[in-house]
Swiss-Prot record:
CDD domains hit by this protein: Hip_N
Residue intervals of the STI1 domain: 391-430
Entry keywords, A to Z: Coiled coil, Phosphoprotein, Repeat, TPR repeat
Name of this protein: FAM10 family protein At4g22670
Family: Belongs to the FAM10 family.
Length: 441
């Protein structure tokens, strides 16, 4: 038997040893039957393999790394603990409050009216009557007199302040706040305005705002009534402030934890993406090639030299059928050898190429175009490629993408050689390769 066929048979047997499921291939049923006829025992489960499984290559064994590439890489992130929403507790407060009064707003004075001396005197008389009614406990009557006084003299902050204090006695905090605001618009330093508004806000349970107004009133004109109200208001205001700070802190801590979880998740996702890319890169670099020069030229020389170089005198016309196969190792290698072949040397040779290219390298390439200019004698087909493989300068140049692109361009169209002659990186490589191909002169 031919030594080549024996070598191929040995490779096939080694493949079957490493992966017995190869015997399930329908086209090998005759071989399986032959083995069983000799008494061989086919491993259990081999016959039960799924018939739809794609036959595996006899040349390149599929590796587990290829399968891993299809698996989704999931970052290992700690499960986020779902935290309950923060629910604020009730604050136990002391002091009585009243329901807000929703009566229509009381009559206010017209600040655009010019106040005469007579109006001022009449306003003072109305104020005096209001004080008398107030001392007798006639609050509604006091409100009527003070409203008349405000109408006569709408520029008096005291009139608004007095009416606000009466509304407080009537437990009408909203009306009191309106009068207090009017008094403070006229006189921002009105102690009675701050005092009345602070007491009204305390009645509505607005403890923090009430404390602020009462402190301002006490600063302007301190009295015992303000101090007494503050003693009731301040404890509640402090409790509410502590309560607010507590839950502000809890919310801040919750937001910080969430931000930290998000940061860790993004970091884990980025790490997982990096690990996946690195694994794919390692897998692609370690995956064996189906042929080509060892150490190889990425992507090979695609398609070889289309149509071959024109036939010349001498050499073997049409190239050697079958050509030289790859020598294992270059990713992608010279696919199928250099397709198209380089039959019978270049007619006249390319510039700087002595005597043309060697006879066809490639898997049964197409014969070159007949005829052409007579060459100076074709080169023998059995060129020693070790001269290229053992040349460190050429092998280093092959790893340069720019050089490889130029070589591929020349291989596709030899006429493009001229445009690369001026490239200081490419021209020396092409010249050196021409010298290797030319052989002894």
């Amino acid at each position: 038997m031919d030594s080549t066929k024996l070598s191929e048979l040995k490779v096939f047997i080694d493949q079957c040893k490493s992966d017995p499921s190869l015997l399930t291939t329908p086209s090998l049923s005759f071989f399986r039957d032959y083995l069983e006829s000799l008494g061989a025992k086919i491993p259990t489960g081999v016959h039960e393999e799924d018939k739809d499984t794609k036959p595996r290559s006899f040349v390149v064994e599929e590796s587990d790394d290829d399968m891993d590439e299809t698996e989704e890489v999931k970052p290992k992130v700690e499960e986020e603990e779902e935290e309950d929403e923060i629910v604020e507790s009730d604050v136990e407060l002391e002091g009585d409050t009243v329901e807000p009064d929703n009566d229509p707003p009381q009559k206010m004075g017209d600040s655009s009216v010019e106040v005469t001396d007579e109006n001022r005197e009449a306003a003072q008389e109305a104020k005096g009557k209001a004080m008398e009614a107030l001392s007798e406990g006639n609050f509604d009557e006091a409100i009527e007199h003070l409203t008349r006084a405000i109408t006569l003299n709408p520029t008096s902050a005291i009139m608004y302040g007095n009416r606000a204090s009466v509304y407080i006695k009537l437990k009408k905090p909203n009306a009191a706040i309106r009068d207090a605001n009017a008094a403070l618009e006229i006189n921002p330093d009105s102690a009675k305005g701050y005092k009345s508004r602070g007491m009204a806000r305390a009645m509505l349970g607005e403890w923090a705002e009430a404390a602020k107004d009462l402190h301002l009133a006490s600063t302007i004109d301190y009295d015992e009534e303000i101090s007494a109200v503050l003693k009731k208001v301040e404890p509640n205001a402090h409790k509410l402030e502590e309560h607010r700070r507590k839950y502000d802190r809890l919310r801040k801590e919750r937001e910080d934890k969430k931000a930290e979880r998000d940061r860790l998740r993004r970091r884990a996702e980025a790490q997982a993406a990096y690990d996946k890319a690195k694994k794919e890169e390692q897998s692609s670099s370690s995956r064996p090639s189906g042929g080509g020069f060892p150490g190889g030229m990425p992507g090979g020389f695609p398609g070889g030299m289309p149509g071959g170089f024109p036939g010349g005198m001498g050499g073997m016309p049409g190239g050697f059928p079958g050509g030289m196969g790859g020598m294992g190792g270059m990713p992608g290698g010279f696919p199928g050898g250099m397709g198209g072949g380089m039959p019978a040397g270049m007619g006249g040779g390319m510039p700087g190429m002595g005597g043309g290219m060697p006879a066809g390298m490639g898997g049964g390439g197409m014969p070159g175009a007949g005829g052409g200019m007579p060459g100076g004698g074709g080169m023998p087909g059995g060129m020693d490629f070790s001269k290229i493989l053992n040349d460190p300068e050429l092998m280093t140049a092959f790893s340069d993408p720019e050089v490889m692109a130029a070589l591929q361009d020349v291989m596709k169209n030899p006429a493009n050689l001229a445009k690369h002659q001026a490239n200081p990186k490419v021209a020396p490589v092409i010249a050196k390769m021409m010298g290797k191909f030319a052989g002894p002169q």
